[in-house]
Amino acid sequence: MNIILFGPPGAGKGTQAHRLVHDFGMVQLSTGDILRQAVKEGTEVGKIAGELMKAGKLIPDDLMIRILGERLDKPDTKNGVIFDGFPRTKPQVEALDKLLAERHSKLDCVIEIKVDENALVKRIVGRYVCAQCGAGYHDEFKRPHKEGVCDICGSTEFKRRPDDNEEAVRARLVEYHEKTAPILPVYEARGIVAYVDGMLPMGDVATKIAEILKEKGAKPISA
């Protein structure tokens, strides 16, 4: 089963994708990760991409599609994939359709994680991580058991992402609505979009997503 997790930055797409990888044996295909791996492996398209990246240039859609196609051809994608960061534009929607059709496959489901944006800003601005082990915390929702000490490794050093401030977060939301959100109606017209309340606890969101996928025929790997 091939799916897209859809929603604004900070909606929890990454967290839910990790759950699906674990529970359903799916592969998360992040365009950034795929690109870096292709460059590292030194494939033909990877070399071209590497030169563009060194020059500070954007990767064109046709090259990204070729890299994505190479990744889809690897055997670990047999249980399906979660597309992360792609597609983001209508031409990319068409390119993904073609890419899957060439492999006698298709996109089965788009799950939109719906969130209240003011609450989302609060969620993002308050998050921070342990500087040593990367364990995640939040000013309001998940503080360390002992103030100032990481629950996992005992470190007393923490850090925040530089762009996790309200101004930057709202700018990312504006960009999302202008550039990415317009592709959702394309999938809605096909009748393959399902909606999940992203303001529920993370475990409940995961349960809802799993129920949607099971209804569409996906089987957990433990089943």
Curated annotation (Swiss-Prot):
Gene Ontology biological process terms in this record: AMP salvage
Single GO molecular function: ATP binding
Catalyses which reaction(s): AMP + ATP = 2 ADP
Region annotation NMP: where it falls in the sequence: 30-59
Subcellular localization, as worded in the UniProt entry: Cytoplasm
Binding annotation for AMP: 31, 36, 57-59, 85-88, 92, 160, 172
Keywords: ATP-binding, Cytoplasm, Kinase, Metal-binding, Nucleotide biosynthesis, Nucleotide-binding, Transferase, Zinc
Keyword Metal-binding annotated: yes
Cellular component per GO, a single term: cytoplasm
EC number per UniProt: 2.7.4.3
Region: LID, residue numbers: 126-163
Residues bound to Zn(2+): 130, 133, 150, 153
UniProt: ATP binding residues: 10-15, 127, 200
Alphabetical list of NCBIfam families matching this protein: adk (TIGR01351), PRK00279.1-2 (NF001380), PRK00279.1-3 (NF001381), PRK14527.1 (NF011100), PRK14532.1 (NF011105)
Domain notes: Consists of three domains, a large central CORE domain and two small peripheral domains, NMPbind and LID, which undergo movements during catalysis. The LID domain closes over the site of phosphoryl transfer upon ATP binding. Assembling and dissambling the active center during each catalytic cycle provides an effective means to prevent ATP hydrolysis. Some bacteria have evolved a zinc-coordinating structure that stabilizes the LID domain.
Official protein name in the record: Adenylate kinase
